[in-house]
Design a protein with these regions (language model features):
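Short acidic/polar active-site loop segments enriched in Thr and Asp
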Residues: 89-90, 197, 216
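Zn-dependent metallopeptidase/amidohydrolase metal-coordination segment
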Residues: 204-238
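Conserved active-site and cofactor/substrate-binding residues in soluble primary-metabolism enzymes
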Residues: 27-31, 71-78, 86, 133, ...
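Flexible, glycine/charged-enriched surface loops at secondary-structure junctions
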Residues: 43-48, 150-162, 256-264
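Generic non-transmembrane alpha-helical segments
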Residues: 141-152, 209, 248-259
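His/Asp/Glu-rich mid-to-C-terminal helical/loop segments that flank catalytic regions of hydrolases
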Residues: 227-264
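Metabolite-binding pocket within alpha/beta catalytic cores that recognizes anionic/polar moieties
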Residues: 1-145
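Active-site rim beta-loop-alpha module in soluble metabolic enzymes
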Residues: 132-195
Length: 264
């Protein structure tokens, strides 16, 4: 393994440095990668291994990569680590989530400014009292991009704030089946009282790697639904359409490319 790890081709994502752009979009689902890559110019698949499907094209003349991370913090952290080894330094996670705060409804976009570290991966990167925060410039670019596609209508809005990252999907959606359900429900209640916007599984790990490796990271999530709104008797949408989040991420990369050029 040492000889493979020391080589130029990355051990898990199987890319070479020349395969990867400075700017990277990180969906979780490998099947979503070709859809995102269609929004780039001249995109081609450069690697595929395990949960990692990797395409690279150009945007505004700059090389941009799309790489899936699979589900959860460990595989997401591996992807970011190896993409950084190939020269990437700017990452936008795009994914789906379950709404938490009552102002978030299904179909809304959530731009993550930070993530609750309710998972285990970040403990390998950050002290327990260090926050998993997104890069301000990436958050700002996502905000400006979201403004182009959003309205004040339910299911077509955007929000910026703290998201919840977890390890167990079913621990959240079916806590009654867990022997530690009291702890799960108590933490969930605390996160709701703190105004956490939505729950997902990768942002904290991606942000933590970015902090430690000095890379710029952010995330934009589609809220699929919000069970808390349903509990409160409020109207809610249910959707699996991630097209707005994809467009937001691509437009944010455009903004960052332009500003990086202007500030070079």
């Amino acid at each position: 393994m040492a000889s493979i790890m020391d080589g130029e081709r990355q051990f898990h994502i199987r890319t070479l440095p020349e395969d990867v752009g400075r700017y990277v979009i990180l969906p979780g689902d490998p099947n979503r990668v070709p859809k995102i890559a269609q929004m780039l110019d001249d995109a081609v698949q450069v690697a595929q291994n395990r949960e990692y499907n990797v395409y690279t094209g150009t945007l505004e003349g700059e090389k941009v990569t799309v790489c899936s991370t699979g589900i959860g913090g460990p595989s997401a952290a591996i992807a970011v680590e190896e993409l950084i080894k190939c020269g990437a330094d700017t990452f936008i996670r795009i994914g789906t989530s379950g709404g938490m705060d009552l102002k978030v409804s299904g179909g809304d976009l959530v731009i993550a400014s930070a993530a609750v570290r309710g998972e285990g991966t970040t403990a390998e990167y950050l002290p327990v009292d260090y926050p998993a925060v997104a890069d301000f410039l990436v958050v700002d670019a996502l905000k400006r991009a979201a403004e182009f596609t959003s309205t004040n209508e339910i299911g077509n809005r955007y929000h910026i704030g703290v998201v919840h990252s977890k390890d167990s999907f079913y621990g959240e959606v079916e806590p009654e089946n867990s022997p530690v359900k009291e702890n799960i429900n108590s933490r969930w209640k605390s996160y709701l009282e703190c105004g956490c916007l939505t729950s997902e599984m990768e942002c904290a790990a991606i942000f933590a790697v970015g902090i430690v490796r000095r890379a710029r990271c952010g995330g934009v999530l589609t809220a699929l639904w919000n069970v808390e709104r349903s509990k409160a008797g409020l109207p809610d949408n249910i959707t699996d359409d991630s097209s707005r989040a994809i467009r937001c991420a691509v437009d944010a990369i455009r903004i960052l490319i332009k500003e990086d050029r202007d500030n070079f």
